[in-house]
Regions:
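Acidic/polar loop patches that form or flank catalytic/metal-binding clefts of enzymes
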Residues: 1-2, 18-19, 295-301
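A cross-family structural signal marking well-folded subdomains
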Residues: 2-228, 324-327, 344-345, 376-390
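Short Fe-S-cluster ligation motifs
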Residues: 116, 317-337
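Betabetaalpha-Me/HNH-type nuclease active-site subdomain
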Residues: 185-323, 350-353, 358, 365
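Acidic, carboxylate-rich catalytic segments that either coordinate divalent cations
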Residues: 332-390
Length: 391
């Protein structure tokens, strides 16, 4: 299809402009090649981001050339082939930036970085990134944050990828028309928030049931990193915590509180030893821990591990053993106020912490609907003071 598109461009371009066409085409191929992107996937998502398609008939890679021939005037191929190619090249350059967690200006964007960690080889969200690349930098960053939250909800609730593609392609038309903060807010509310509302129950259930064997390990690390990062942000309100890099570094490990390789004494002491392996991999049994501490706490029982958890710089991990306090009513105190501390580690504790993290996740990924504090097991609503970190 790429060669056919190139031929089509030559057919529509006057001979005196062939040198410009050749130069731009080479730049396009080189740009996609440099970031290892498949040209056909790029073209397919380019079309989805820029043109309205029949939602009942998905655009396949085999259909791309036919689409361009049938829609050559709409795409700009007929009247301004070089302008069309320039737009294509701009999108390829943006695509390369997105893959490097950068916005169209080349600035690092933490939400794009998070999407890179979360998405693996998936690229469906690039449809929306291309459709929104015209937005001012601050608004584009807000769009990226909203995409991250939505994309994660799709992943955790096991939404089929064809749903991502269909939704993102349909929504692109409205996103292309959003030019400022007000329009973007309305777009996010109409498309993202309304979609998330329908998935809220599934999101909560997925977190209550989440365990290592249900999700790829790089995504479990992302989840633990986001939960840990959120508490740090609430406590310190410091831009140093904006990046997930420090939470997913090789110096940080996923710690199993109930140990992976227990001594016989540890396994026998567990209250549901016949279900040890099931509880071992639950989200509630996992936390991030610095490697230097992890080697010292290793496979012992909980009471022996507690001093190690107290040494952690991560408040979510440290709060297993204690709630750090500084002065009276400080931001740090409020950040850890609703985390639960555990005297012993059994099946009930793991289930309790899993529920706590599930309630925390609603804040972390900004899910719409009713919210409860992480330590609140009752159905009452809460105010949002803790969430915003206001004085």
């Amino acid at each position: 299809a790429m060669d056919l598109l190139k031929n089509l461009l030559f057919m529509k371009t006057s001979p005196d402009e062939y040198p410009t066409l050749k130069h731009r085409w080479k730049d396009l191929i080189d740009t996609l090649g440099a970031c290892g992107e498949k040209p056909l996937r790029f073209l397919r998502y380019f079309i989805m981001a820029h043109f309205e398609l029949d939602s009942k008939k998905p655009l396949r890679e085999d259909d791309i050339y036919d689409w361009f021939t049938k829609n050559s005037k709409l795409a700009g191929l007929e009247d301004q082939p070089l302008v069309f190619l320039k737009t294509l090249l701009e999108c390829a350059t943006s695509w390369r930036n997105f893959l490097s967690a950068k916005d169209v200006t080349g600035a690092i964007n933490p939400y794009l970085k998070n999407l890179t960690l979360l998405s693996g080889a998936a690229r469906q969200h690039f449809i929306l990134l291309l459709a929104g690349r015209h937005l001012p930098q601050q608004e584009f960053s807000r769009l990226c944050r909203a995409i991250e939250n939505l994309f994660f909800c799709y992943i955790i609730t096991r939404e089929p990828t064809r749903t991502f593609e269909r939704n993102f392609a349909i929504w692109s038309a409205d996103l292309r028309n959003a030019k400022d903060e007000t329009a973007l807010n309305q777009f996010v509310k109409d498309k993202f928030t309304s979609d998330l509302e329908k998935r809220r129950a599934a999101f909560d259930f997925a977190f209550q049931e989440l365990k290592q064997s249900r999700i790829q390990q790089y995504r479990m690390r992302y989840i633990l990193a986001k939960l840990t990062q959120y508490i740090e942000q609430q406590a310190w309100n410091n831009s140093a915590h904006d990046s997930l890099d420090q939470f997913i570094a090789s110096t940080v490990e996923v710690e199993h509180i109930l140990p992976q390789n227990p001594t016989n004494l540890v396994k026998e002491a567990f209250d549901k030893k016949e279900r040890y392996n099931e509880y071992l991999e639950k989200l509630g049994n996992l936390t991030l821990l610095e490697k230097t501490i992890n080697t010292s706490v290793s496979n012992d029982h909980y009471q022996k591990k507690v001093p190690g958890y107290r040494q952690s710089s991560y408040l979510l991990t440290r709060s297993l053993a204690e709630k750090p306090k500084v002065g009276l009513n400080t931001q740090l105190n409020r950040a850890v106020e609703h985390l639960i501390t555990f005297d012993q580690w059994n099946s009930e504790a793991i289930e309790c912490r899993q529920g706590m993290l599930a309630r925390l996740a609603v804040f972390v990924w900004d899910m719409p609907g009713k919210r409860k504090m992480p330590d609140d097991t009752t159905p009452e609503l809460i105010n949002s003071e803790w969430e915003t970190g206001d004085e």
